[in-house]
Amino acid sequence: MLMKHGMSLFRYLLTTLFLLVIFTSSTSYSKKAAIVIDFDTKEVLFEVNANTKNYPASLTKIMTLYILFDRLEKKQITNQTKLKVSRIAASRSPSKLYLEEGSTIKVEDAIMALIIKSANDVATVVAENISGSEKDFAKLMTSYAKNLDMNS
């Protein structure tokens, strides 16, 4: 059930992010890359520079959200769970919420910050609180991606 609902949510978030970028961007597509694929038919609906290698940036935030939603559904955390902010997280460059070392942020607020602001400091807070480090969280994201049959 999680995979069905989780995948639907994941597809929704990806599509929303894509559309948000398209409709709010004032620059041309020549410097960006995008691809939209129909999940069921595998038909490419739209693509621009789809084969160019790029840093995944916001896609990692979407996977971070996916993992948070999975943990919420499994009741491993709640919306009220407080995530501690480390020195590393507080030092992340923009986009950020300017969280202070030693402070906390509730899961529900972290979710909103990731969706609305794509906050790097919050992504680091989530990673460190779930996996202990960004490096270990990256391994967890890779594991989730493989379970979702995602590949590069």
Residues covered by each model-derived region:
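Bacterial N-terminal signal peptides that target proteins for export
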Residues: 2-14
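Bacterial N-terminal signal peptides
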Residues: 13-22
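Active-site-adjacent loops and short helices of periplasmic peptidoglycan-processing enzymes
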Residues: 24-152
